[in-house]
Amino acid sequence: MKLVIVESPAKAKTINKYLGDEFKVIASFGHIRDLPSKKGSVLPDKNFAMEYDISDKASKYVDAIVKYARKAEAVYLATDPDREGESISWHVAEVIKEKNKVESDDFFKRVAFNEITKKAIIHAVENPRKLDTNLVNAQQARRALDYLVGFTLSPLLWRKLPGCKSAGRVQSVALRLICDREDEIERFKAEEYWDISLKMQNSNNELFTAKLTHVNDQKLKKFSIINEKEAKDLTRKLKLQKFYVEKIEKKQQKRQPQPPFITSSLQQEAARKLGFSAKKTMQIAQKLYEGVDIGKETIGLITYMRTDGVTLSNDAIADIRKLIDKNYGNKYLPINPRIYQSKVKNAQEAHEAIRPTNITYTPDNLKQKLEKDYYKLYELIWQRTIACQMENVIMDLVIANLASENKEYLAKANGSIIAFDGFYKVYRESLDDEDEEDNKMLPPLKAQEHIKTKEVIPNKHFTEPPPRYSEASLVKKLEELGIGRPSTYASILSVLQDRKYVTLEKKRFIPEELGRLVTVFLVGFFKKYVEYDFTAGLENELDEIAAGKLEWKTSLNNFWSGFNNNIESVNEQKITEIINYLQKALDYHLFGENKESKVCPSCKTGQLSLKLGKFGAFLACSNYPECTFKKSIVSGNDNNEDEGNLSTILNDNKILGTDKDGVEIYLKTGPYGPYIQLGEQCGKVKPKRTPVPTNLKQSEITLEVALKLLSLPLKIGIHKDSGEEIIIGYSKFGPYIKYMCKFISVPKKYDFLNLNLDDAIKLIENNKAKLEKKHRSMV
């Protein structure tokens, strides 16, 4: 038996039917090993050793893989053809080697394919290769970088900015883009400007519109007419003028089709045309790639969907051209096939573009066989693929230059018409911020023809701020900057929303206050690591590792030495210094240009300043506790929700850190006082909670103290005489020792969290002596 291992059951089902009975196809269900979410999973001091664990979820799949591998004559690793897929295959091979004592690498065959079709699968199985260690190392380097940033920067954030959940190597840079754009919008000052339109009529009484372009031989610029008075003066003068056609220009314009889809362009176009999120687009594309049921069979309908290559195979181009000729006619078919070059920064071109695996499966053929959203995305991919090999669109353009009889004023009218629809026959690309007017034809005009001016219209405009990022435009910007890779865009956008750092309103990203705080903090104290060029440079290094041009641990060492020094430096910063910096950096956002807006509206003498608390960021008066005014700056929290004791709000819901499993530990305040909580409530399952001892101040509750409290009740040893367990615990009556079903109070003079066995036995014996003395006195 030959064992074939893929990532998903759907992919396994599709591949299984193409291979004979000698093959057994099973799924790993994604990654079987990963770095556990705890300290020490990557060890810089040990040459970046990485401690991988098999998750509880993956263990049953690993058992099946190991069992079948014992019976197999060879293992075919058929995971996705990218770094992530190579990494999954490597982990599978490593686990099989360890569990089954396999020593030879020849036992493993790496098979890679760009599409799940019978031809591609058979060819891959017949032509296996060895695992590409360069690709594996590139993925390990990326994972290590993300871990080192997350598990050193996030805890620092929890200490310095209570309420902030995490920071990531790439997500923080994407967040900065969104926040920087919001800063531009807030600081933007609209400027007034005017232009003049003229409604004209030709000799056949046909109307058209022209725009004033020159006055006294001076070309009008955007701000040539800056107020209503100037516009009205010009309007009055133009009404007295007679115009004629000075010159007619005619020319043709050709529009070329866009390249076939890559990951980013598919996400952008699906967002514009279909309203799909990047996450939804990738989920559907994954299913279309792995295989869907179309009635008589399950087939993979598209090629691999994580790619930055725009090339198409020669066979695919031949099939596309054949279909164009058959369905649309020879005039829509260029003489030569179109060959595209990627414009993506650092594109790898390792895979084909995203295309249908069989171009003869037209959308019409599949409309009744696919789910609605699956059909929409497949149709988009099919149309773009066909269009990319079709003829140009040809536009006939007409430009009429008009002049006043005294030559003092010039105007221009434009018109266009589609002379040949070319690839428009199948597909038209959308624009993210479309501002093009509909194409209009001009009526017939002749040179020297006199034109009547029917109306002169002054048009008032204001400059507009840059638009907020949509999913499509943010992905495009990340791609232009060389930040992230095709496989990461969707997850970056999802994480920012899941962390409540940004919201998506009317399909545009708006940063939340927490998101802005994190960004300002990182720009202030970790500026290098959220610079666009630096992050893109790391992506370049990962590409060099994948190409075998750079040793991966050298790259990690170069990054870590500087980053760790930065962490240690910021750790020494006082929280007051950080708050002061945040206050200064966010001053314009919070108060604008009006200094009076900083004055406390309650006491009239204090100054408002930034604070962080239970409900996010808010403003509080500097005269606290004499003045308890506060105002939430988080959307939706200007209500009684944040009323209460200000000192409580400042310390409530503080994240202390995480336990060994990566679960967050909170310091909270309830109706009965402060308490420690492990994790969030999940449905009806309440998280573990323990009260804070009354002799401890909230400022004394560190992560170490919280972990000790959560570990209670805890066995601290065995009594040397009786052999019975001694347990330390804490209840509403205070700390206690439990011994032989008896509860013994721990006096305040003892640090009960660090109580040793000898002291515990001493307390037990003292309690025993007291009881015996009491008993004798009663007798």
Curated annotation (Swiss-Prot):
GO MF terms, alphabetically ordered: DNA binding; DNA topoisomerase type I (single strand cut, ATP-independent) activity; zinc ion binding
Sequence ranges assigned to domain Topo IA-type catalytic in this UniProt record: 132-568
Pfam family, one: Toprim
Keyword tags: DNA-binding, Isomerase, Magnesium, Metal-binding, Topoisomerase, Zinc, Zinc-finger
Annotated catalysed reactions: ATP-independent breakage of single-stranded DNA, followed by passage and rejoining
Chain sites annotated for binding Mg(2+): 7, 80
Region feature Interaction with DNA, mapped onto this chain: 166-171
Claim: Membrane is one of the keywords in the record: no
Catalytic residues (positions): 304 (o-(5'-phospho-dna)-tyrosine intermediate)
EC number: 5.6.2.1
Cofactor or coenzyme needed: Mg(2+)
Site (Interaction with DNA): 31, 142-143, 146, 158, 306, 499
Keyword tRNA-binding (UniProt): no
Domain Toprim intervals: 1-111
Residue ranges covered by zinc fingers (C4-type): 600-627
Any one GO BP annotation for this protein: DNA topological change
Record's GO cellular component terms: chromosome
SUPFAM superfamilies: Prokaryotic type I DNA topoisomerase (SSF56712), Zinc beta-ribbon (SSF57783)
Family indicated by similarity: Belongs to the type IA topoisomerase family.
Reported function: Releases the supercoiling and torsional tension of DNA, which is introduced during the DNA replication and transcription, by transiently cleaving and rejoining one strand of the DNA duplex. Introduces a single-strand break via transesterification at a target site in duplex DNA. The scissile phosphodiester is attacked by the catalytic tyrosine of the enzyme, resulting in the formation of a DNA-(5'-phosphotyrosyl)-enzyme intermediate and the expulsion of a 3'-OH DNA strand. The free DNA strand then undergoes passage around the unbroken strand, thus removing DNA supercoils.
Subunit annotation: Monomer.
HAMAP family linked: Topoisom_1_prok (MF_00952)
Official protein name in the record: DNA topoisomerase 1
Native species: Rickettsia typhi (strain ATCC VR-144 / Wilmington)
